[in-house]
Amino acid sequence: MSANENNLIWIDLEMTGLDPERDRIIEIATLVTDANLNILAEGPTIAVHQSDAQLALMDEWNVRTHTGSGLVDRVKASTVSEHDAELATIDFLKQWVPAGKSPICGNSIGQDRRFLFKYMPQLEAYFHYRYLDVSTLKELARRWKPEILDGFKKQGTHQAMDDIRESVAELAYYREHFIKL
């Protein structure tokens, strides 16, 4: 294992909602691939403690989804703060990618980055300013070649590591079926 500036950092957050001014991070996971999307390492998947008062602000969809997955129970039992989760994630990433080299990779990753900027600024700063957002290809495929969308189905567990693995697989699918190389 050595840090390589061509490796890609994939990240997913689960949050109590979509508004970083009101909602908080409740789970973070990262993995690293090489430039060809081969998974090199999975980082820690961390349930981030939030207060009962914060969890009570979740809307019906988030309560149903995160209770059903067991995440709410893991968050309540966790003793890991956002800051500690941030530092553990950076420690993992330093082994694989130098700071400032990898774009932030994932699905609808701009939303995750908004939360990182507010609650995990050191981690947000670890990424290059660019984005590798798989949802961009999905939106283009929906408009330009909608028939290929049926070829990739997500499980949609809304568990951070599962979601990242699906994002990597989805990009590999688009590389094979949508992008002409």
From Swiss-Prot:
It comes from the Bacteria. Its EC number is 3.1.15.-. It holds the Pfam family RNase_T. GO terms for cellular component: cytoplasm. It is an enzyme of class 3 (hydrolase). It is found in: Cytoplasm. SMART domains: EXOIII. Signal peptide: none annotated. GO terms for biological process: DNA metabolic process. Residues 8-171 form the Exonuclease domain. InterPro entries: Exonuclease_RNaseT/DNA_pol3 (IPR013520), Oligoribonuclease (IPR022894), RNaseH-like_sf (IPR012337), RNaseH_sf (IPR036397). GO terms for molecular function: 3'-5'-RNA exonuclease activity; nucleic acid binding. The active site is at residue 129. Keywords: Cytoplasm, Exonuclease, Hydrolase, Nuclease. 3'-to-5' exoribonuclease specific for small oligoribonucleotides. PANTHER family: OLIGORIBONUCLEASE, MITOCHONDRIAL. Belongs to the oligoribonuclease family. This is Oligoribonuclease. It comes from Klebsiella pneumoniae subsp. pneumoniae (strain ATCC 700721 / MGH 78578). The lineage of its organism: Bacteria, Pseudomonadati, Pseudomonadota, Gammaproteobacteria, Enterobacterales.
